Swiss-Prot record:
<keyword id="KW-0645">Protease</keyword>
<feature type="glycosylation site" description="N-linked (GlcNAc...) asparagine">
    <location>
        <position position="530"/>
    </location>
</feature>
<feature type="disulfide bond">
    <location>
        <begin position="236"/>
        <end position="265"/>
    </location>
</feature>
<keyword id="KW-0378">Hydrolase</keyword>
<keyword id="KW-0964">Secreted</keyword>
<keyword id="KW-0479">Metal-binding</keyword>
<feature type="active site" description="Charge relay system">
    <location>
        <position position="240"/>
    </location>
</feature>
<dbReference type="InterPro" id="IPR000859">
    <property type="entry name" value="CUB_dom"/>
</dbReference>
<dbReference type="InterPro" id="IPR043504">
    <property type="entry name" value="Peptidase_S1_PA_chymotrypsin"/>
</dbReference>
<feature type="domain" description="Peptidase S1">
    <location>
        <begin position="52"/>
        <end position="299"/>
    </location>
</feature>
<protein>
    <recommendedName>
        <fullName>Ovochymase-2</fullName>
        <ecNumber>3.4.21.-</ecNumber>
    </recommendedName>
</protein>
<keyword id="KW-0865">Zymogen</keyword>
<comment type="similarity">
    <text>Belongs to the peptidase S1 family.</text>
</comment>
<dbReference type="InterPro" id="IPR018114">
    <property type="entry name" value="TRYPSIN_HIS"/>
</dbReference>
<dbReference type="InterPro" id="IPR001314">
    <property type="entry name" value="Peptidase_S1A"/>
</dbReference>
<feature type="glycosylation site" description="N-linked (GlcNAc...) asparagine">
    <location>
        <position position="104"/>
    </location>
</feature>
<keyword id="KW-0732">Signal</keyword>
C-alpha cells in the first residue's frame, strides 16, 4: 500500500462526502455483513485531510473481511470474504491454475510477520474465474471466486463484507477505502502490517481520458478508476485482489471494487508526456458490473434461507437459470404477524424472467399481499386472492418480490417457479403469458400477417419510467368489425385493473395514435369463434412528460386471466 506524501490537494468533493461520515453512523447490532470493530471517527476538517494525504496502518479488526492469499506462506494477493465459504479476489492472482494447490487463504490476518490471535487458514476447494477474463486483456473482468475447503468462523476479527444491492452504485467523488499488505513504495518491500488509504472514485470520462494518454490505451467494460491526478496515494503490488470498500447508506462497508491494476504505484497522470514516467489511476473491477455473475455462483447464508418463514426486512438473493420459491417452505410453518419479506430474483444477463404460480392463498390486498417490482424498482402490481394468476413474462433479467403480512393473517402462502427465457421466446404475440415490458417496441397479433386464431386472449402491459406517457401507434388494423366492437377487438387501458378504458378498436381503418395519461398501458386482444382476419401491428413508444407519482397497481385475480 503506497503511503508516500504529496502536496495538499483540496477537493470539494472530499469535503462534501466526508461530512456525511459522522459519529452518528451506526451499524446493525445483529451479526451481519460490513461490520468492523473499529468505530467511525467523528468528522473534522483536519482529520479528513490527514487521512487522505497518506496511507496509514490500520487498527486490528478494522476490516475483518480482508484475507491474505498465500503461496507457501508468502503473501501474494488480497481478497474479501463475502460468506463463510466464499472469497472474492482478482482473476490475475490465480490465472496460473498450477499454483492453486499451493495456495492458502488466511482470514483474521493483521501482521504478516507473526501468527495473530484469531487467524484462520483454509485451503481452496474451487476456483471460478470469470469466463470473460483473458490474460491478453487482464484489466477487464478481473475477478475470481474462491470456495474454501471448509468455512470461516465469524467473530471479532473475521467476518464478511456486504455485496452491493442491485443497481446500488457509488458515484464519482465518493471517497472509498482500499487496504492491503502491498508495497509501501514502488519497487519497495511488502508491508508487514495491514495498511489503508482513502481514494475518490473518478468519473468514467476522467478515467477514459487518463487511460487514453498511455502508450497502450486500455479499454474495458467492467472497471472503475480511483485516485488523484497528481498521484501520491494508491494501491501497489501485493494489494491485488483486495477490496475497494465504501460505506452504504446504512453505514455498512460494501464491496465496490476488486483491486486490479495500475501503471506504477502512486504515479500522477496529469502530465503523461514522458513515456517512462507515465502513471494511471488505480483500476478496480466494478462489482456492480458483475454482480449477477457473483450471485449465480455463490450460495450465501441468506440465500439458503430463501424460503424461511420469518424473514422480516431481509433481502434474499435467489438466482440461477431456473428455480422455485415456496413461502413458507413447509405446510407446517407459519410466519409471524406484521412481517415483510423481500426476494430478488436474478437470471443470467440478457435473459427474461418467466414466473409461474402453482399455489396462491393470500387474503385481500388491503391486509396481506405479494407485490412485484421490475428492474429499476418500477411497480408491476400486487397479487392476492386464491385464483392462480397466469404465467407472467418479465422483460428484464431481475425481479423483486415483496411479501407483506398484517397483524392477523399468518396462514397465507404461495409457491412459484421462475425460469430464464431468451427475449422473444414467444415472439410478439402476448398470448402465451401475461407479458410485462419496460422498453419501447413492436407488438402484433398472433400469426401476423397471417390470420389470427379463434378464441384468442392476449395481453401486454407496458410500464414506462416515471414522468413518461405511453403512445400506441398502429401500422395496420384488420379485425372483424362489429357495431360495438364486442366480437373481435383491441382494448387499451391506462391501468391493469381494466377500469380505465381509453380505446376499443375493430374494423379495417388504421386509427389515430392512442395516448395513455399514465406510465402504464394495458393492451388486450380478443377474438371469438366466428371467423378471423389478419389482425394488427403497432409500435409502443414512451414520451417524456412531467408526471405524477406512479401508484402501485393491484392485480385482482382472476381478472387478468389468459385463455388460449
Amino acid at each position: 500500500m503506497l503511503i508516500s506524501r504529496n502536496k495538499l490537494i483540496l477537493l470539494l468533493g472530499i469535503v462534501f462526502f466526508e461530512r456525511g461520515k459522522s459519529a452518528t453512523l451506526s451499524l446493525p447490532k445483529a451479526p451481519s455483513c460490513g461490520q468492523s470493530l473499529v468505530k467511525v471517527q467523528p468528522w473534522n476538517y483536519f482529520n479528513i485531510f490527514s487521512r487522505i494525504l497518506g496511507g496509514s496502518q490500520v487498527e486490528k479488526g478494522s476490516y475483518p473481511w480482508q484475507v491474505s492469499l498465500k503461496q507457501r506462506q508468502k503473501h501474494i494477493c488480497g481478497g474479501s470474504i463475502v460468506s463463510p465459504q466464499w472469497v472474492i479476489t482478482a482473476a490475475h492472482c490465480i490465472a496460473n491454475r498450477n499454483i492453486v494447490s499451493t495456495l492458502n487463504v488466511t482470514a483474521g490476518e493483521y501482521d504478516l510477520s507473526q501468527t495473530d490471535p484469531g487467524e484462520q487458514t483454509l485451503t481452496i476447494e474451487t476456483v471460478i474465474i470469470h469466463p470473460h477474463f483473458s490474460t491478453k486483456k487482464p484489466m477487464d473482468y478481473d475477478i475470481a471466486l474462491l470456495k474454501m475447503a471448509g468455512a470461516f468462523q465469524f467473530g471479532h476479527f473475521v467476518g464478511p463484507i456486504c455485496l452491493p444491492e442491485l443497481r446500488e452504485q457509488f458515484e464519482a467523488g465518493f471517497i472509498c477505502t482500499t487496504a492491503g499488505w502491498g508495497r509501501l513504495t514502488e519497487g519497495g518491500v511488502l508491508s508487514q502490517v495491514l495498511q489503508e488509504v482513502n481514494l475518490p472514485i473518478l468519473t468514467w470520462e476522467e478515467c477514459v481520458a487518463a487511460l487514453l494518454t498511455l502508450k497502450r490505451p486500455i479499454s474495458g467494460k467492467t472497471f472503475l478508476c480511483t485516485g488523484f491526478p497528481d498521484g501520491g496515494r494508491d494501491a501497489c503490488q501485493g494489494d491485488s485482489g483486495g477490496s475497494l470498500m465504501c460505506r452504504n447508506k446504512k453505514g455498512a462497508w460494501t464491496l465496490a471494487g476488486v483491486t486490479s491494476w495500475g501503471l506504477g504505484c502512486g504515479r500522477g497522470w496529469r502530465n503523461n508526456v514522458r513515456k517512462s514516467d507515465q502513471g494511471s489511476p488505480g483500476i478496480f473491477t466494478d462489482i456492480s458490473k458483475v454482480l449477477p455473475w457473483i450471485h449465480e455462483h455463490i450460495q450465501t447464508g441468506n440465500r439458503r434461507k430463501s424460503s424461511r418463514a420469518w424473514c422480516s426486512e431481509q433481502d434474499v438473493i435467489v438466482s440461477g437459470a431456473e428455480g422455485k420459491l415456496h413461502f413458507p417452505e413447509s405446510l407446517h410453518l407459519y410466519y409471524e404477524s406484521k412481517q415483510r419479506c423481500v426476494w430478488t430474483l436474478l437470471v443470467p444477463e440478457e435473459m427474461h424472467v418467466l414466473l409461474s404460480f402453482s399455489h396462491l392463498d393470500v387474503e385481500s390486498c388491503h391486509h396481506s399481499y405479494l407485490s412485484m417490482y421490475s428492474l429499476e424498482d418500477r411497480p408491476i402490481g400486487k397479487f392476492c386472492g386464491e385464483s392462480l394468476p397466469s404465467s407472467i413474462l418479465i422483460g428484464s433479467n431481475s425481479l423483486r418480490l415483496k411479501f407483506v403480512s398484517d397483524a392477523t393473517d399468518n396462514a397465507a402462502r404461495f409457491n412459484l417457479t421462475y425460469k430464464a427465457l431468451k427475449p422473444n421466446y414467444i415472439p410478439d404475440s402476448g398470448c402465451s403469458y401475461l407479458t410485462v415490458l419496460f422498453e419501447e417496441g413492436l407488438i402484433q397479433s398472433l400469426n401476423y400477417p397471417e390470420n389470427y386464431s379463434d378464441k384468442a386472449n392476449c395481453d401486454w402491459i407496458f410500464q414506462a419510467s416515471k414522468h413518461h406517457l405511453i403512445k400506441l401507434s398502429f401500422q395496420s388494423l384488420e379485425i372483424e368489425e362489429s357495431g360495438d366492437c364486442t366480437s373481435d377487438y383491441v382494448t387499451v387501458h391506462s391501468d391493469v385493473e381494466r377500469k380505465k378504458e381509453i380505446a376499443r378498436l375493430c374494423g379495417y381503418d388504421v386509427p389515430t395514435p392512442v395516448l395513455s395519461p399514465s406510465s402504464i398501458m394495458l393492451i388486450s386482444f380478443h377474438s371469438d369463434e366466428n371467423g378471423t382476419c389478419r389482425g394488427f401491428q403497432a409500435t409502443v413508444s414512451f414520451i417524456p412528460k412531467a408526471g405524477k407519482k406512479i401508484e402501485l397497481p393491484t392485480l385482482w385475480f382472476p381478472v387478468l386471466i389468459l385463455v388460449m
